[in-house]
């Protein structure tokens, strides 16, 4: 009997040994990690006109991180500590990690909560016996200047031109027409005006209802389970149109491709300049993750949940080359899903990864962002500016000539009279 049990357990033991050995090997070869995550649970971005609750239910106001969101981000930090405990120093080392956030309260607070879970102070870093937390820097830039993490950028007219083209596509029109009656009905309930395209108000309504339901707040009678489900479907389709359906590579070059390019450049700096940096953390939004995954061609079509995290790991192989593995943590009950770049199995050689990403990386973002109309306007404006400057210079030159002549007359003529 014992012999039979041993025989039955042998395959499982070897399997576990193989998994453990493989994991240890990958950990030993790990060189650099990038973690891009969405902020935690928040209050609604806005309310709809007929919302019976309005802003009064949210203690810190609309758009703000909730206590549940803080807990979610803290748990994300603890997950990252468990996963990279043998890679990162056990104590905070400013040379090993760099954290950047978009300039929003909820993302800045999410970054801080995650760092609290990743780097609980110990030893000499305990600065107060009653506070098991330490301040760690989180960097940001003004939202109006953030092209790395906040998409789409308002100063990219070509992107909005692409979206106007997208909504003219038959696939888009067919979907919108199928929801026409539904959207008219919801518009009446919410106080919005029904439109022929999927307006942002549809997402606002869904977002408000989702947040209220998540916090056990009663929904209006018209917001049945079927209504909320359809609103979710419409919102997901609307999101999909921003990264798929019509000129996807060009859309990516103007949005998520910017972040892909930055990640590759940062890794190149780490390798070529022998930088001690081991991890980059980006605290951002669902739109950031969608744009990134859209550029990578791994977007699953689902809305990224709170605290979802896209991880990119860079490894050094035995032959000196590097490879890339990607993981997506969109739930907490299981380990992250491994993602494979289309056309390259995981782990993907870095050279192949870079080549596959080339079509979504812009060589001149400002130029690519200029629509035909805005480019012509800019050229016309430049020509007008040159003409105006030429006229001003001409007038100024003529004025100076007249003034000099007058001065010459004033000081030169008396001398002539004296000589005479």
Swiss-Prot record:
Q: Which residues are glycosylated?
A: 29, 122, 188, 216, 266, 272, 330, 352, 383
Per the record, ranges on the Cytoplasmic side are 407-420
Q: Which SUPFAM superfamilies does the record match to this protein?
A: Phosphoglycerate mutase-like
Residue ranges spanning the membrane: these are: 386-406
Principal localization?
A: membrane
- For this protein, what is any one GO molecular function term? acid phosphatase activity
E.C. number, please?
Answer: 3.1.3.2
List the ranges whose topology is Extracellular.
25-385
GO cellular component entries: lysosome; postsynaptic membrane
Q: Can you supply a Gene Ontology BP term from the record?
A: regulation of neuronal synaptic plasticity
The disulfide bridges present are: 156-369, 211-309, 344-348
Q: Where in the cell is it found?
A: Membrane
Q: What class of enzyme is it?
A: hydrolase
Could you tell me the membrane topology recorded for this protein?
A: Single-pass type I membrane protein
What chemistry does it catalyse, as a reaction equation? a phosphate monoester + H2O = an alcohol + phosphate
Q: Which Pfam families match?
A: His_Phos_2
Please list which residues make up the signal peptide: 1-24
Active site positions, chain numbering: 39 (nucleophile), 286 (proton donor)
Keywords (A to Z) from UniProt: Disulfide bond, Glycoprotein, Hydrolase, Membrane, Signal, Transmembrane, Transmembrane helix
Database matches in InterPro entries: Acid_Pase_AS, His_Pase_clade-2, His_PPase_superfam, Histidine_acid_phosphatase
Q: Which family does it belong to?
A: Belongs to the histidine acid phosphatase family.
What does the record note on quaternary structure? Homodimer.
Q: What is this protein called?
A: Testicular acid phosphatase homolog
